[in-house]
Amino acid sequence: MIAKECKPITREASIKPSIENVIPYNEYKKTQPRILGVPQVIQGTNDDDMIVLYGGGRDFILSLLDNEINSNKENGINSINVELFILNKCILMWFKDLGRGIEISYNSVIYHGSNRIQGEDSRDGHRYELVVTVERDLILNELFPVYGEEHSDALSKFSLRSVEFKLRPRYSTYDRYYNVEIETLFTFHNFGVNRGDEMVKNCNDAIALCLEMNENQFISSEEEDLDVETSAYDNEQNTMNQDSNSAVYTGINEVYNTYQNSGYGDDLDGNNMIMDNKFMKNGVEAGMSMEFYNNEAITGQKRPMS
């Protein structure tokens, strides 16, 4: 059985993450019991009711990377103020001006990293920006359309369509500013100095961690399906073998499903004369057939002759 490919789909988000509906990872470690033998960092991905926040930030400026398709233009959009939430289930970008957001599946993330800012905007504590490239779908095409000349249909059919997000912190690590509202989610206790280059590093590490967790789950589900299919195939083969050939061919008889044990099966008694000189009787060598049940190990001990 071949599993059908499940293509990730970006979804619209109408509820903004807050301290009431998500829990920071540091708080999660304190409040949730630890399961023996299971890394605590992975437990949050298995609970459908638990949404864990691993990273993010409030003041990001979103734009798109230049590429050949848009002819060195930013796809016709201006910079947008967004808030980034890196959750155990998805990456959520919240558009402040729209009061809406989008949930990006980790399976659609192609690559991520930090890009060094060039030019006069680069200064101490404000030298890097976060880059996240994701596979396009219907919602992303509608929100971030591609302008300019399109490739041929034959090439587009087999090409991976992607959109490259640039998330630049508004403030430097060393800037002093005051929030309009009291911060209850991205606190210093949970995320440290979450500004400027430190915020980029924290977000990049959080995405890498969540990608690894979701990849492990995807691999585990594939292995479970493969094990089930393999077990079913082995059982079927064993059943067929048992029905068609209930006895193992030992090489001393040309007829299946029968046993003919003749001669002397005493080659473990330590008598070198029998080992060196094959004792033949009626043209048949010594033989012995054994059958093991339930895969139980059979152990024995060689006893010297008295």
UniProtKB/Swiss-Prot annotation:
<dbReference type="Pfam" id="PF03517">
    <property type="entry name" value="Voldacs"/>
</dbReference>
<protein>
    <recommendedName>
        <fullName>Protein LOT5</fullName>
    </recommendedName>
</protein>
<dbReference type="GO" id="GO:0005634">
    <property type="term" value="C:nucleus"/>
</dbReference>
<dbReference type="GO" id="GO:0005737">
    <property type="term" value="C:cytoplasm"/>
</dbReference>
<keyword id="KW-0963">Cytoplasm</keyword>
<comment type="similarity">
    <text>Belongs to the LOT5 family.</text>
</comment>
<keyword id="KW-0539">Nucleus</keyword>
<dbReference type="InterPro" id="IPR039924">
    <property type="entry name" value="ICln/Lot5/Saf5"/>
</dbReference>
